[in-house]
Every structure is written in structure tokens, then in C-alpha cells.
């Protein structure tokens, strides 16, 4: 499994220290254990988790900007946890409305000493942190427009949304911000289509 992750990271053109890669794999084993009782993810094998969770999450790393990142609907921690592992200099806030998921994330952050993450259990529309984020990430949670509307109050002017999608979201992009750019993501070992919708916040 170590070699599979290393090869995948190399294919993505990223540099992640081996110690960090080992922590990522340990996190997956921890998730697998919790998943038996709490059903946090439908993907249960470590090999598949590496592809569908770790490498999929890390594929958006080149597009990450700023120091304050909000991961919306973080669930079992994707893409927030892998990104936090890879970018210890950035501050990540992971928000989810479900108690069992935030409980897992709190335990994981403590166990693996992920000191650059803050875990919040709340609906994102009600979240008022008192500051703005530079980037908002989201995977598998609602349409592009819905995500933008629910989180607009949290993103600074000039900041960006990075919304992860499967197939090209043509219908979702109709009527949304004209500054949307869609990147094709090539995730090593993943045959399914993956796209990243990047939208800049042009509010004054």
C-alpha cells in the first residue's frame, strides 16, 4: 500500500514527505476501523481508499490558494484531511452537520496530531466564524450553485471555490458565475471521470 500511494503521488506531480504519506495510510486504517461501527464511507478496502479518497483529494492540491481553507461537508475527512497533512502551513476548517462524522474527525485530528485543522459540527449556512476564508473546498455535496449560495458569506472577495465533481457538470454551470473554470482531474488508478470547478468570488 505504501508503494501504491507513493506512485500515485508521483504521478500527480506532487512532493509529499514519506513520513506524511505514512500518516495518511495510518489515517485510512483508523477510518477503516471506525467505519465498521459508524458507516462513514462506502469504500471499505484500504487499496480503494488510497485511490478514491487520498489521491482523489490530493489531485486538487495544485489549485489550493491562501492560508485559510474551509472544507464543506467534510464527512470522513475528504478532501480536508489529506490536504491538511500535505500543507501543514495552512489552516483548515472541516465542517459537517453530522455528529458521528465530526466525532471521528476530532478523534483522528487528536490521534495523528493534525494541529492545523479545526472541526466544526454545524450546518454551513448557519456558520459564522467571524472571518473569511481564502478557499472553500467541497466534494460530493449538492450542485455548484447550491454550494456557492450556502457558503457565499464565508468566502473573502477574490477568494475561490474548488468544487469537486465526477462527470463534466454542464447543466450545473448554466447560470452560475461566468468566471468558472473546469479542470480535468487525472487521478491515478481511478477510471471514473473527475472534474474540478474553480470559481472566483467577485463580490465587492
Curated annotation (Swiss-Prot):
S-adenosyl-L-methionine binds at residues 73, 78, 139. Keywords: Cytoplasm, Methyltransferase, rRNA processing, S-adenosyl-L-methionine, Transferase. Its main location: cytoplasm. The keyword rRNA processing applies. GO terms for molecular function: rRNA (guanine-N7-)-methyltransferase activity. It is found in: Cytoplasm. InterPro entries: rRNA_ssu_MeTfrase_G (IPR003682), SAM-dependent_MTases_sf (IPR029063). Its EC number is 2.1.1.170. It catalyses: guanosine(527) in 16S rRNA + S-adenosyl-L-methionine = N(7)-methylguanosine(527) in 16S rRNA + S-adenosyl-L-homocysteine. It is an enzyme of class 2 (transferase). It comes from the Bacteria. CDD domains: AdoMet_MTases. One of its GO terms (cellular component) is cytosol. Belongs to the methyltransferase superfamily. RNA methyltransferase RsmG family. Specifically methylates the N7 position of guanine in position 527 of 16S rRNA. This is Ribosomal RNA small subunit methyltransferase G.
Amino acid at each position: 500500500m505504501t508503494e501504491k500511494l507513493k506512485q500515485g503521488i508521483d504521478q500527480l506531480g506532487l512532493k509529499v514527505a514519506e513520513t506524511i504519506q505514512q500518516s495518511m495510510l495510518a489515517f485510512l486504517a483508523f477510518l477503516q476501523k471506525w467505519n465498521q461501527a459508524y458507516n462513514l464511507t462506502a469504500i471499505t478496502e484500504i487499496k480503494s481508499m488510497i485511490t478514491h479518497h487520498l489521491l482523489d483529494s490530493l489531485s486538487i492540491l495544485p489549485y489550493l490558494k491562501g492560508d485559510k481553507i474551509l472544507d464543506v461537508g467534510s464527512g470522513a475527512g475528504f478532501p480536508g484531511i489529506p490536504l491538511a497533512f500535505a500543507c501543514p502551513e495552512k489552516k483548515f476548517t472541516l465542517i459537517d452537520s453530522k455528529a458521528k462524522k465530526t466525532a471521528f474527525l476530532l478523534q483522528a485530528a487528536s490521534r495523528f496530531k493534525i494541529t492545523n485543522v479545526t472541526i466544526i459540527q454545524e450546518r454551513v449556512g448557519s456558520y459564522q466564524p467571524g472571518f473569511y476564508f481564502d478557499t472553500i473546498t467541497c466534494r460530493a455535496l449538492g450542485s455548484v450553485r447550491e454550494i456557492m449560495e450556502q457558503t457565499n458569506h464565508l468566502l473573502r472577495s477574490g477568494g475561490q471555490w474548488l468544487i469537486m465533481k465526477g462527470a463534466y457538470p454542464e447543466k450545473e454551470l448554466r447560470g452560475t458565475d461566468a468566471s468558472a473554470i473546469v479542470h480535468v482531474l487525472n487521478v491515478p488508478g481511478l477510471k471514473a471521470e473527475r472534474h474540478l470547478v474553480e470559481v472566483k468570488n467577485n463580490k465587492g
